[in-house]
Amino acid sequence: MKRIVSLLLALSVFAMVAGADNKPVTFEQLPDAAKTFITSNFKGVKILFASMDDDLIRPDYEVRLADGTEIDFDNDGRLEKIEMKSGAVPSGIVPVQVKDYVKANYQDVLIREYEVGLRHYEVKLSNGLELKFNKSFQLIGIDD
């Protein structure tokens, strides 16, 4: 009996997760912080697509720009991740401590991705390396 209840519970959770999907949204439907971020850092770049991932807990947003940039925001419009297809992540986005570390240790390398985690920051460089920093901006990991 416990197995049947467990199986039904698992199937119910799976069905709810599978039902959560991306829904197209307009620029105006994005959280205010996300709109400000986009207009401040990508003035004049066309938004190709914006969507809301309506998951079980809190929705989040994904925006794709005409230059190939992909940006993820949380429910409140705070940046979660930015990925550049060409060029570097705009300089005002990455914390100065992270930028200084990259500049001092990796000359002629661009920051292509920047991700904000609960306890860390992560950047992916144009040379393929991924650097992970704690919230005190100390390097805690390198992955290639």
Name every feature range the model reports, one short phrase each:
Residues 1-4:
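Positively charged n-region of N-terminal signal peptides that target proteins for export
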Residues 16-20:
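Sec/Tat signal peptide C-region and signal peptidase I cleavage site
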